[in-house]
Amino acid sequence: MRTLEDSSGTVLHRLIQEQLRYGNLTETRTLLAIQQQALRGGAGTGGTGSPQASLEILAPEDSQVLQQATRQEPQGQEHQGGENHLAENTLYRLCPQPSKGEELPTYEEAKAHSQYYAAQQAGTRPHAGDRDPRGAPGGSRRQDEALRELRHGHVRSLSERLLQLSLERNGARAPSHMSSSHSFPQLARNQQGPPLRGPPAEGPESRGPPPQYPHVVLAHETTTAVTDPRYRARGSPHFQHAEVRILQAQVPPVFLQQQQQYQYLQQSQEHPPPPHPAALGHGPLSSLSPPAVEGPVSAQASSATSGSAHLAQMEAVLRENARLQRDNERLQRELESSAEKAGRIEKLESEIQRLSEAHESLTRASSKREALEKTMRNKMDSEMRRLQDFNRDLRERLESANRRLASKTQEAQAGSQDMVAKLLAQSYEQQQEQEKLEREMALLRGAIEDQRRRAELLEQALGNAQGRAARAEEELRKKQAYVEKVERLQQALGQLQAACEKREQLELRLRTRLEQELKALRAQQRQAGAPGGSSGSGGSPELSALRLSEQLREKEEQILALEADMTKWEQKYLEERAMRQFAMDAAATAAAQRDTTLIRHSPQPSPSSSFNEGLLTGGHRHQEMESRLKVLHAQILEKDAVIKVLQQRSRRDPGKAIQGSLRPAKSVPSVFAAAAAGTQGWQGLSSSERQTADAPARLTTDRAPTEEPVVTAPPAAHAKHGSRDGSTQTEGPPDSTSTCLPPEPDSLLGCSSSQRAASLDSVATSRVQDLSDMVEILI
């Protein structure tokens, strides 16, 4: 509710400002009446809100007057209640409005006037102060409200006087409904007349700041206030002693009752009775008593009958004095806060002034804009009239142009008929020419179709020729593969023939050696039998002959087993050779097929270009095959050279013989066990050569996994050297044929039986070594 009241007051305030600046007097009065009614409603409901609102809307000049008028009142009237507001309202209703030339009352006059009516209201119940001299909590609250209403009454009286005076000076007589407790600051600000009050005719008036509590009035001020003709001109006996009522606010309720009795006696008699001497001695009225009262006061002080009552009253006065001092301090603090509020009000008024100036500038700008709009509107009207005239001229021109166009169209229709006849004749001729051209086009289309069919036939013939060429190339490739196979088979056959020749030579040598050994053994037997028969010991030669025959039988069995192993390894070699050859043939055919598929799937943009490209690709393939054949032939020659070098190296190193024990006559020779153990000799060959040389060894070990070698591994000096194609394997330092020869039979003649057995063992081991060398050569 407080916010709504403030907002409504602000809106009314702005409206009244605008009306004061730009409106007429009747509307201004109406708005002022509305504001006064609204503020009256706020004073009736809010209590203490209306005086603050009246203070906030006063002008800076009025705020200076109100700073003097808002002196904190003493709170000695505990007996005053809510009736003060009614008394003030009745006071302002009964008070006649001052005329146009009447001067405003001073602060002391207005305060004395309000205190008089407050004292009249309090006179009906003088026993309230006797019942509760110290003041209960409810009584103190009523005293605060009474003092607040009293201060608000002073402010209202001054604001009403200022408002009425400003309205009269502006030439407007204020209506009766505007005499309320609130004013408007714009009236005081717009007031530019003479000051509110001039000095009286009797002399200058000493009108200083409002008295602060405790206040002591000087004697000459009291005499001037009493002898002031304005108090006597009021027509009421209560204004003759205004200074007594001014100081009633500083006297406690007990003295207020005595003062009221004193005033009553003073009004009824010319020489009033004096007040109590103790009260005048200790209260603030002791310095303000008139000279006519001093004699009765001194006479009253000499009486000793009421001493105890006076002492009690003096204690009560002292207590009230202390309480009033505390109230005075509190009221001084309130005065400081009200001064701060007044400063804020001044700032607010300056802000309102700035806003009003801004509003004036806006109104000037709006007036300029309206003038500019008016000129632009006039200009637009003239432009519209000009455009309407121009549009009228254009319509007339359009009508004349339409008339001319209609006449021209009639003439054009007459000429167009002649043109149509000519065009019909020309179209007939063009149709005949078109039919002739269509016949020629049909003939050309037939010729084009014939040429297309001929081209298709040629393309088919070209495709057939290309297919025949591709088939011929495939056949040529197959024949070349067959030729390569034949060449490889011939080379293998040559190698086999060489191996067979070597084997035959070895067999011949072995046969001759065995025959020689047999002859030597027989000769030894005969020689051994002859000395035995002569000596008569026939048991030992028979035993030696039996032993030798058994050894011979064992050797023959070993030889037969080795021969069987040799034939077996020859068969395996041939099988591996054939399988390797077939794998190479399959790889060659797969490469040829891949080349043919690439050639077939290659794009052929045109028949002639495809035929030429086919020829070129065929030539390239022939060249590639020739280069491949040359490379293979070079590899074969290189391998043959390596084989020859290895053979020569094996012949150069005759001193390296391999010793190894014989195993039972089974299948696998000891060569491959030695190859598995002696891997140090492979360091001189490349990785590819090692792989090709290891292939047959892996095959043989896979085929015979269950066979266990019995022969011990050869020493590290014995190492295999394989050829580049992996077709043959030879030991690094093979023994020469001379090392394989048996010892001479003559050397065994003079030896004993043990020596002969050792020699036979050595011969057998040499034979086994020769057989292993032969098997390696064959492999």
Swiss-Prot record:
Positions of short motif PDZ-binding: 776-779
Pfam families: Angiomotin_C (PF12240)
Effect of mutating residue 408 to R: Abolishes monoubiquitination by WWP1 and reduces interaction with LATS2 and YAP1
Maturation and modification: Monoubiquitinated at Lys-347 and Lys-408 by Crumbs complex-bound WWP1. De-ubiquitinated at Lys-347 and Lys-408 by USP9X; the interaction may be promoted by cell contact inhibition. Deubiquitination of AMOTL2 negatively regulates Hippo signaling activation. Phosphorylation at Tyr-107 is necessary for efficient binding to SRC and synergistically functioning with SRC to activate the downstream MAPK pathway.
Residues modified as Phosphoserine: 759, 762
Keywords on record: Cell junction, Cell projection, Coiled coil, Cytoplasm, Endosome, Isopeptide bond, Phosphoprotein, Ubl conjugation, Wnt signaling pathway
Coiled-coil positions: 308-581
Skewed-composition ranges (Pro residues): 196-213
Sequence ranges of Gly residues compositional bias: 530-539
GO biological process, alphabetically ordered: actin cytoskeleton organization; angiogenesis; endothelial cell morphogenesis; establishment of cell polarity involved in ameboidal cell migration; hippo signaling; negative regulation of transcription by RNA polymerase II; positive regulation of protein localization; regulation of cell migration
Annotated site, Required for interaction with YAP1 and ubiquitination at K-347 and K-408, chain positions: 213
Modification Phosphotyrosine occurs at: 107
Cross-link entry Glycyl lysine isopeptide (Lys-Gly) (interchain with G-Cter in ubiquitin), positions: 347, 408
Region (Disordered): 41-215, 263-308, 522-543, 679-753
Compartments (UniProt record): Recycling endosome; Cytoplasm; Cell projection, Podosome; Cell junction
Keyword Phosphoprotein: yes
Family per similarity comment: Belongs to the angiomotin family.
Subunit structure: Part of a complex composed of AMOTL2, MAGI1 and CDH5, within the complex AMOTL2 acts as a scaffold protein for the interaction of MAGI1 with CDH5. The complex is required for coupling actin fibers to cell junctions in endothelial cells. Within the complex AMOTL2 (via its N-terminus) interacts with CDH5. Interacts (via N-terminus) with MAGI1. Interacts (via N-terminus) with ACTB; the interaction facilitates binding of cell junction complexes to actin fibers in endothelial cells. Interacts with CDH1; the interaction may facilitate binding of radial actin fibers to cell junction complexes.
Protein purpose: Regulates the translocation of phosphorylated SRC to peripheral cell-matrix adhesion sites. Required for proper architecture of actin filaments. Plays a role in coupling actin fibers to cell junctions in endothelial cells and is therefore required for correct endothelial cell morphology via facilitating transcellular transmission of mechanical force resulting in endothelial cell elongation. Required for the anchoring of radial actin fibers to CDH1 junction complexes at the cell membrane which facilitates organization of radial actin fiber structure and cellular response to contractile forces.
PANTHER family assigned to the protein according to its UniProt record, in alphabetical order: ANGIOMOTIN, ANGIOMOTIN-LIKE PROTEIN 2
UniProt name for this protein: Angiomotin-like protein 2
Gene responsible for this protein: AMOTL2
